[in-house]
A protein has these predicted regions:
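N-terminal, intrinsically disordered, polar/charged segments of Gram-positive cell-envelope systems
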Residues: 44-120, 124
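N-terminal Lys/Arg-rich, disordered targeting/topogenic segments
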Residues: 1-20
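Conserved oxyanion/phosphate-binding beta-strand-loop segments in alpha/beta enzyme cores
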Residues: 170
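Hydrophobic membrane-insertion alpha-helices, especially the h-region
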Residues: 24-39
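Extracytoplasmic/lumenal domain signature
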Residues: 101-152, 173-213, 218-291, 295-335, ...
Length: 635
């Protein structure tokens, strides 16, 4: 019995051992099969990743460490901890990273594809154009710009702080910069002043004195790195937050001031040519100034008026153009317009009174670290002639003048500009084809303003004209001065305000009536208003009128005893409350409540103010025909 029990016990142990062996063998076989599958998959993945083609025979050299990594096996690579550059979820210690919000999708710019309709076709005006590229004329229908010009909204024209072209940007809607923190809503009664000389006129008697029409100063707070390479005086380089005022004057000199104190920041530049227009700075922050003279030089040699590109590193002239251009039709070489620069294509856009539009590929080479700048210009010219434009061989009373004295507005790839002969033209800058023309009746000197309105950001232009004696009426009479809102897509008039009939004084003391100063478009609490200075409404009087953008009706108007050739400047306080600054022939600068037209303050500057002010925060800079430049603080 005992033997039988021992035998059963031994048999039971043997069965358990055999079962254990079977189970172990089973698991070993399973593990071997799985490992084989994993190894095969791993090799296939590695081979495909190395060659990009599993069937490729090409031998790929492995980077250092890759062979060792492969030896670690598929699981090691599969579960290897990734760094944040690989997946953006964990840092190199394996800790979760904070989730970054996605970049917002940029809002696409509204399309702008202008075209003509009945009454705005260029052919209705007998418009003819020609193009010259690098000195050779070409078929106007064959021209296409090598680099596409495409401007954005006016407020994106530059990242610089200040007012760097006439009325600030390509919409011509920003003659002031920053915020005017006013408590008293008054002019400070202790302005700084600087005396400017004069220059004998080339033709006739008298002299060009002080600052004339349009005469706006340029205001800029240069980046500190740019100041360091300029020929500024040491104290100016060291003054933190310096606001530099740059003023091209009719004395033939370009002056540089501290806008807060009137102290000269550097030596003036002498050119021997009188400047009426504002000039312009480069929107990219390059130390370049673009400026053209308003008359021929009476100095020794009696040189012809033209335009300059000046280095503001050392005051040297880098390039001159427009002098007795053989491509011109009209004999004048004056430049009262204020230029614009397309930053992306490095293109200077400069209209002239000769009737030529200059598009200059600058090929700028600026090395701030080395303190050097150079240009290698490539010039394209466009000119026009309409059926009613006269030429040098036709008396002025028998035909309207060629040429552009106002400053161009640009939106996307199209420029809108008026001329001396009663045309408002929309020009495609990439093909130099005229898209539409609107009749402005007379010699048009004012610079309009471009706005985008409504939910669809539809573009409009506000524009008016002047009264040139003997074209529409004799100089002893008056002529209508309409104010228009114009659809920038088609050139059609949206509304017309016909409130004004103006006079003009003939030569030798010619004073043109109508709108000579430029429009101001309200923003913030003035958003629905447009401001227009009208001259010679009754004798030497004039008005500043605020019109509703929607329909052209009058919101308010104020009558001056002296006409306003100067342009209105809106300024805004920290709450968006808007005020209007307006200067006049009587020598006064006025401050108005922009919504109501209430006169808040005025100051006598001593002589005729044809020039337009520019404002940086609380600091106004303005010049007079009497030869003084003023720096006035709003308080």
């Amino acid at each position: 019995m005992a033997k039988r029990r021992r035998r059963r016990s031994r048999n039971s142990r043997r069965r358990r051992i055999r079962n254990a062996i079977r189970i172990t063998l089973f698991f070993l076989i399973v593990v071997a099969i799985i490992s084989g599958i994993i190894l095969l998959v791993s090799k296939l993945i590695n081979k495909g990743g190395e060659t990009g083609d599993i069937g490729s025979d090409a031998a790929i050299e492995q980077p250092v460490g890759q062979e060792q990594e492969e030896k670690q096996g598929f699981f090691a690579r599969l579960f290897k901890k990734k760094d944040k550059e690989q997946d953006g979820l964990f840092d190199e210690e394996g800790n979760p990273l904070a989730t970054q919000p996605p970049e917002p999708t940029p809002t696409p710019l509204p399309e702008f594809s202008p075209y003509s309709v009945a009454g705005t076709s260029p052919s209705d005006f007998g418009l003819e154009t020609k193009i010259e590229v690098d000195g050779s004329e070409m078929d106007a229908s064959q021209y296409t710009a090598a680099d596409v010009i495409d401007f954005e909204e006016g407020y994106k024209y530059t990242q610089l702080e200040g007012v760097i072209t006439f009325r600030g940007n390509n919409f011509r809607d920003s003659p002031s910069y920053g915020t005017a923190s006013m408590t008293e809503k008054k002019f400070d009664t202790s302005p700084w002043t600087f005396t400017v000389g004069s220059m004998q006129k080339m033709y006739g008697s008298g002299s060009w004195s002080g600052c004339g029409w349009t005469g706006q100063p340029l205001l800029i707070r240069w980046p500190e790195s740019t100041k360091r390479i300029m020929n500024m005086r040491d104290w100016a380089k060291q003054k933190e937050g310096l606001i530099e005022a740059i003023y091209a004057t009719m004395s033939g000199n370009i002056y540089f001031f501290d806008a807060e104190t009137g102290q000269e920041t550097r030596d003036h530049i002498s050119t021997a040519f009188p400047f009426k227009g504002a000039g312009a700075l480069d929107p990219r922050g390059y130390p370049l100034m673009y400026v053209g003279s308003g008359d021929d030089s009476p100095t020794e040699g009696k040189d012809t008026s033209h335009a300059f590109i000046i280095s503001l590193i050392d005051g040297s002239v880098l390039y001159e153009f427009g002098k007795q251009d053989s491509f011109r039709i009209r004999g004048l070489s004056y430049f009262d317009s204020s230029a614009l620069v397309d930053a992306e294509t490095d293109t200077l856009i400069y209209p002239g009174e000769s009737g030529i539009l200059y598009l200059i590929k600058l090929n700028t080479n600026y090395d701030e670290a080395a303190g050097t700048i150079s240009i290698s210009p490539k010039v394209t010219k466009w000119r026009y002639k309409g059926a009613k434009n006269n030429t040098d061989g036709v008396a002025a009373r028998d035909g309207f003048w060629l040429g552009m004295e106002d400053s161009a507005m640009i939106w996307r790839g199209h420029m809108i500009i008026a001329d001396n002969g009663g045309h408002l033209m929309c020009i495609d800058l990439n093909t130099l084809q005229v898209k539409w023309v609107q009749d402005t009746l007379d010699d048009t000197n004012c610079t309009g303003v471009l706005t985008l309105e409504g939910e669809d950001h539809h573009p409009y232009v506000y524009m008016s004209t002047s009264f040139h004696p003997n074209w529409r009426a004799r100089d002893t009479q008056t002529a209508p001065i309409p104010i228009w809102k114009i659809d920038a897509v088609t050139g059609e008039r949206v509304w017309t305000n016909n409130d004004y009939n103006c006079q003009t004084i003939a030569k030798p003391n010619q004073v043109s009536g109508g709108v000579q100063g430029s429009f101001a478009s309200g923003k913030n609490d003035l958003e629905g208003l447009i401001f227009v200075p009208v001259s010679m409404t009754e004798g030497m009087k004039g008005e500043l009128v605020a019109l509703n953008k929607s329909d052209g009706t009058v919101k308010w108007r104020y009558t001056f005893q002296g006409y306003p050739w100067s342009s209105p400047v809106p300024v805004y306080d920290q709450n968006g409350k808007g005020y209007i600054i307006q200067c006049t022939k009587s020598g006064y600068i006025h401050l108005f409540d922009g919504l109501t037209g209430t006169l808040l303050d005025e100051m006598n500057l001593g002589s005729n103010v044809e020039a337009s002010p520019a404002v940086f925060d609380n600091h106004i800079v303005i010049g007079t025909r009497g030869g003084l430049i003023y720096g006035i603080k709003l308080k």
